[in-house]
């Protein structure tokens, strides 16, 4: 099983379709770079239809979920991409409805991981959903990855997703390198010390 440590350079050797049939829960730190860059289609090709916590995204633009809140502040091109993504509810993504058990887990994790997830309702919901439904989390959030590791929940972060995209021939290696280093990190300010490099067309996160 893939390690959930954010700081580790993990070699990915997963068959295409790895995510098929699995519960894949995405948080805002993954949705934002893929959607804002215009690559929401690539996220879908990699992971399929993702499940998203209600505090992270809502199909109603007026709601104040994490993803929605930036629409009013973003440059128009990015704002329109986010509005378009909201309209793809039921296709590219589905909003999760938390069960009573998951709500109990949210409160349990709120106390247990107070140091790492305080004030992060979206991350708490994401962790609870993935734990109860035996799912996988897509995130770039270090605190969430720490908590998920403690709960034996598998995580993938954006650089790893792009490595898989190259391995599965969804995108050329040079395009993935540019997308991650120049667009995600430099332009969209994704917080990451990692960079994606292509050596002999082999992608690596270092």
Residues covered by each model-derived region:
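Active-site-proximal, substrate-binding regions of enzyme catalytic domains
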Residues: 2-135, 142, 160-163, 177-184, ...
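Short secondary-structure boundary/hinge segments and terminal tails
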Residues: 61, 147-148, 166
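Basic (Lys/Arg-enriched) interaction patch that binds polyanionic ligands
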Residues: 139-151
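Short secondary-structure transition/capping segments
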Residues: 149-153, 168-171
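Long, charge-dense
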Residues: 158-172
């Amino acid at each position: 099983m893939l390690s959930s440590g954010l700081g580790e350079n993990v070699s990915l050797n997963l068959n295409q379709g790895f995510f098929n049939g699995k519960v894949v829960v995405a948080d805002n730190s993954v949705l934002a770079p893929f959607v804002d860059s215009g690559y929401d289609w690539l996220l879908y090709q990699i992971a399929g239809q993702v499940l998203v916590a209600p505090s992270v995204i809502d199909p109603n633009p007026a709601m104040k979920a994490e993803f929605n809140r930036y629409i009013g502040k973003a440059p128009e091109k990015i704002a329109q991409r986010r509005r378009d993504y909201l309209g793809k509810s039921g296709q590219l993504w589905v909003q999760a409805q938390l069960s009573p058990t998951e709500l109990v887990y949210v409160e349990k994790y709120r106390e247990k991981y107070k140091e790492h997830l305080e004030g992060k309702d979206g991350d708490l919901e994401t962790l609870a959903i993935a734990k109860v439904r035996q799912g996988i989390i897509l995130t770039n959030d270090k605190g969430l990855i720490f908590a998920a590791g403690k709960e034996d929940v598998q995580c993938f972060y954006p650089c790893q997703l792009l490595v898989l995209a190259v391995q599965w021939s969804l995108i050329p290696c040079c395009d993935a390198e540019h997308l991650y280093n120049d667009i995600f990190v430099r332009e969209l300010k994704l917080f990451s010390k990692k960079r994606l490099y292509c050596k002999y067309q082999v992608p690596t996160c270092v």
